[in-house]
A protein has these predicted regions:
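Short aromatic-glycine-(Arg/Gly/Cys) micro-motifs in beta-strand/loop hairpins
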Residues: 15-34
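Short aromatic-glycine motifs in intrinsically disordered, low-complexity regions
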Residues: 1-2
């Protein structure tokens, strides 16, 4: 399976805890195509680092 770099264009929600993990809702762009997703983190500190331009794999 191939992974694609995605970049956050807008943070929709602040970090919130659900199912024992921390989540952040974001809008992103990958290969020129916009999308929405929920990013999962192990700690609140990691989730708070998400800002515009944050890179993740999708």
């Amino acid at each position: 399976m191939n992974l694609v770099d995605a970049f956050v264009t807008k943070v929709i929600s602040g970090p919130y805890e659900e199912y024992g993990k921390w989540w952040v809702d974001v809008e992103y762009i990958a290969w020129g195509v916009p999308g929405k997703s929920r990013l999962m983190f192990d700690s609140r500190e990691q989730a708070q680092e998400v800002q515009e331009g944050f890179r993740f794999l999708t």
